[in-house]
């Protein structure tokens, strides 16, 4: 035990979040649950590329071409949100492997708690990289999206 007064002062500053109130999005250090999502999504892409193209996937920039071939084959239905999210996560994983300073974070915005990449003052959301486009009926080019993240 330390000083009770100090603990009471800290506790007095805490605020219980209200149901109907909107809070600003927060970026916190990546948590284990998001690391699990990153690994699960990446492993799904590795096995899908191996299954569909009979090629290895190493998580490097050159692998984006293989990922695009799987997308272009039409094997992933436009309603398969989790699979598209896995592709977005994999593009981010390649960015994290290839670019110094890219760092995984957990985004908490009231609607979801999800892994995102932070680079300098930018946040790269794997869901917005591909799923948002697919959902809107737009074509998905992972090589272009990857290059946009480098600008």
Stretches found by the model and what they are:
Residues 1, 50, 83, 141-142, ...:
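Acidic, serine/threonine-rich, charge-biased low-complexity segments
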Residues 71-74, 94, 98-99, 133-137, ...:
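Generic structural signal for hydrophobic core residues of well-folded globular domains
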Residues 1-14:
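Charged, structured surface patches that assemble and position nucleic-acid processing machinery
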Residues 73-120:
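Amphipathic, interaction-prone secondary-structure segments
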Residues 8-11, 114-151:
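A recognition module on extended beta-rich or small alphabeta surfaces enriched in W/G with H and D/E
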Residues 59-63, 108, 145-146:
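Short coil/turn segments at secondary-structure boundaries
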Residues 2, 55, 101-102:
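Short, well-ordered coil loops that connect the C-terminus of an alpha-helix to the N-terminus
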């Amino acid at each position: 035990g330390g000083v009770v007064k100090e603990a009471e002062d800290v506790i007095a500053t805490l605020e219980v979040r209200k149901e109907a109130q909107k809070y600003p999005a927060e970026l916190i250090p990546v948590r284990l649950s998001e690391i699990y999502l990153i690994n699960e999504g990446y492993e799904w892409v590795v096995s899908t590329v191996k299954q569909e193209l009979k090629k290895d996937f190493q998580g490097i920039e050159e692998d984006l071409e293989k990922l695009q071939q799987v997308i272009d084959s039409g094997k992933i239905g436009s309603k398969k949100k989790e699979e598209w999210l896995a592709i977005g996560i994999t593009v981010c994983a390649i960015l994290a492997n290839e670019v110094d300073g890219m760092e995984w974070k957990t985004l908490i915005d009231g609607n979801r708690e999800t892994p995102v990449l932070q680079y300098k003052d930018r946040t790269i959301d794997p869901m917005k990289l591909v799923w948002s486009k697919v959902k809107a009926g737009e074509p998905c080019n992972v090589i272009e999206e990857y290059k946009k993240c480098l600008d």
